[in-house]
Amino acid sequence: MCVFFATFAENFNYSMALTRTYYRVAEHLFAVDSSYSELLQCMTNYEPFAVEELLGERRKAKGERREDEEIFTLRVEKAIGERLKAKGEGWTHVLTDNAEEDMPRIEVYKARRREGDEAKGEKGWLFRVAMVANAPLCCEMEWSEDFTPGVLHIMADCQDVRFCIDNALMLLYAFRTAPLMTLEMHAAVVVKADRCAVRCQTAALLDRPNGLIDQQELGYLFLGHSGTGKSTHARMWLEAFDDAWLLNDDNPILRVMEDGEVRVYGSPWSGKTPCYNNAYARVGGLVKLSQAPHNKIRTISLPEAYAYMLSSASGLKMDRQMADSMYETIKHVITHVKCYHLDCLPNTEAAEVAQRGMV
């Protein structure tokens, strides 16, 4: 983990030249620009998703549009003072999210539109982030209205650069991909041998040759609020079944493909468990977990499934267009994937009950 006990300004050497790196997550391409050569040391969790050969190809293309155009670019800079120089100066405060004291505080501002102003550059969003509720700001994120280009301003006295990078990319990715039938989920995902083939894009991570898994496998998403036991239940599957493996422990990506297939992908974001698998599986089931003195699984109704999925999906739900996009994606998922509720204990019997109930 890249946590600095000196400041950002003391640890990072500035260069006039921008370095661009490309990453592909759930088959969506994005880019990160920075003038700080040490930045990549903080981004080891992104290495399995790096697309190293792309930069040279882009240079040869000389500006020609490619089918795999990046969906957004994030530029990382050191902040020179706060972007919000005075409260309300050009920005309208629309939300502060700090539900728990030990969780990050996120302040959301929307740029005010001047009368007759239709220029994209004059509209957008400003997110101000602190590591915990009462801490000073560690970074500010300034994005266009459609979340295509973005700038991450890291405060000079920031002690945890990776925290800033991860949060900026997680938020930008979630917001930008919402219209693309993609959802960034708060869930743990286990893949188990079943009826569907899985392609692993980074074979070394799973120690399997040629990037292929010669089994029929499905991915199962375990949903629930923080503290429910998603990671614990996923671990029970690994203990109960020899052919099960962990795809992601906290922030998988759910995507509806052009042919309607629903897939779950690994991501560079995985909470406390370092699980950065660049792989995917067809979704076999979504399971809402509840702690209970017994193990029991049941199929749930579409309204229940919608509510559980919406609460587990990352997105700026106050934005009408984004909310509509999320609705369409969730509607497709819950009508094409079986959804369940599992009352469970933290034991392997819970995994066995869940697995039998989803057959």
What are these regions (language model features)?
Residues C2-V3, R83:
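Compositionally biased low-complexity segments enriched in histidine and/or tyrosine
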Residues S15-G56, E67-A193, E217-L223, M236-W245, ...:
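A noncatalytic interaction/capping subdomain that flanks phosphate/NTP-handling catalytic cores
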Residues G229:
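Conserved glycine(s) of the Walker
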Residues H233:
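Hydrophobic positions on the alpha1 helix immediately C-terminal to the Walker A/P-loop
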